[in-house]
């Protein structure tokens, strides 16, 4: 498990797994812990979404939304999230919770703290992510982050 630092979200699926919140918020909302009920898309808050569903495009769109780019899984005082992509198809985010494990919410499904094999997520780089084969990188979520 990774040590969660100053900003750590608690895994509280009851805040996300109720309608209409569950069906109107996706993995980007969940990872950033910002409920918009708009099914947020990277770059939409900044007015410039990603053009293609490839790692660099989605990552850059997140930076435009005010997230912090990180080279290592250490967000300091910000909340730590991870971006993965299913090349050409979809993106997905995971977030580090205050218990040192990771959790996520796929699209309109329930928030959960297990991977596609049903195992606790210790590290999103090595978890069973299904078709999301490309680990793109780490991002920090701080007060500048805006999603929509």
Curated annotation (Swiss-Prot):
Keywords: Secreted. Residues 105-128 are annotated as: Disordered. It is found in: Secreted. The keyword Secreted applies. GO terms for cellular component: extracellular region. Component of the acid-insoluble organic matrix of the calcified shell. This is Insoluble matrix shell protein 1.
């Amino acid at each position: 498990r990774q040590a969660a630092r100053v900003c750590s979200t608690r895994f509280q699926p009851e805040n996300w797994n109720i309608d209409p919140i569950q069906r109107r918020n996706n993995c980007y909302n969940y990872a950033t812990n910002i409920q918009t009920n708009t099914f947020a898309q990277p770059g939409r808050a900044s007015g410039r979404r990603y053009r293609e569903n490839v790692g660099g495009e989605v990552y850059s769109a997140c930076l435009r939304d005010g997230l912090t780019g990180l080279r290592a899984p250490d967000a300091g005082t910000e909340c730590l999230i991870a971006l993965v992509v299913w090349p050409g198809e979809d993106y997905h985010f995971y977030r580090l919770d205050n218990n040192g494990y990771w959790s996520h919410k796929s699209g309109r499904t329930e928030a959960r703290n297990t991977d596609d094999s049903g195992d606790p997520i210790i590290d999103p780089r090595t978890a069973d992510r299904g078709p999301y084969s490309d680990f793109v990188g780490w991002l920090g979520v701080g007060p500048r982050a805006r999603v929509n």
